[in-house]
Amino acid sequence: MNPLEKVRAELRRYDHALLDFSAREHNGTIELVIELKDRSLGLHTYYAPIHPRDIEHPQFPWTMQRDLYDCMHDYLVEMFIRTPQSRDAAPQDPA
């Protein structure tokens, strides 16, 4: 099994209500791809490289899970439209 197949096989073990997971080869590296199932929202796709040594390591399933969860967190945080730290955020009236 080549590295891309190994990553794809591991990702098939995960099923999420909101997100789709896949992997691709891009510029000579393997990337984790995370997308919303509802593509109509027009939000970006998240890409994260996976290091070859991680794929080859005997603990790959655990490392992949940690990386997947970290990337999911980052992806969801990137979806904020406004935060208190936003420079252009005008104060909002409480509802």
For the regions a language model picked out, list residue spans one by one.
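Negatively charged, low-complexity tracts enriched in Asp/Glu with abundant Ser/Thr
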Residues: 1-25, 54-70, 74, 78, ...
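Amphipathic beta-strand/beta-sheet edge segments enriched in Tyr/Trp
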Residues: 29-44
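Short, charged early-sequence alpha-helical segments and their helix-coil boundaries
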Residues: 42-55
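Polar/charged, Gly/Pro-rich intrinsically disordered segments
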Residues: 44-46, 82-95
